[in-house]
């Protein structure tokens, strides 16, 4: 019997990028038989990839024992005898290049993502303001170059995971619909002003028909506490649920509201409707949540701020662009949310 191919998939970071890879890996395994897939990623992203049936994860401690060149060589030594026949590099970073070079010495072939840097540069400088290939398609192209069929249009969403019992320590068992709101972003230029988001939260909290579940991280804790104490029917998950438990909760949301950030992609993994709010970045760069309706996008006013997108990741923006997201009215956010909640 022919031995199965064994692909080492490399994607070390970040949450959003990892989440985008999930439906691609599902399609890869659904559409190609006799195939093993192992993902090398940061330890904390392990639960994201473990949602894909048939995928193994080999976590890399790139801030610890696998840090630097010496650490990457150690990581290679730990996994080199796992029978990998090819490598799909979805990251295209210095770290992934080191791993590929070491495996190439063993005769393991590899293919690497084309990030479309030139196209993205033209998008930012305004010479080509048009839709670029999605990141999911760029990931799929890597596997296609290795000879595999990956048709994202035939993706099949799996059944929702079972809700952990712990969820009901923060959420009551009632008939309320669950709205996830991830109001924060790594860069301020991608974050909807909190005073405007509060108007959205206030509207839905007072109806008594919804439970608002806020998502955030360590630096957001004080604001999460303040918001949950200021508005009824509003809770947060940080420190109350583990990341794995959050991943089990998200598929059960009726709606997710997110910036151009990871939580929107985590919800899209499970076909949860996602309303995305965009600041100085733009969905044309290819980071739109997987298979979400384009009408669920709320964009900052490009007529008033014509340099949008000022960067791909939101890390660069002119000083006078700090208020771009104030051109998205709370009313427009509320209307879009109600449209989806009542569909």
Regions inferred by a protein language model and the residue ranges of each:
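Catalytic machinery of carbohydrate-active enzymes
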Residues: 1-343
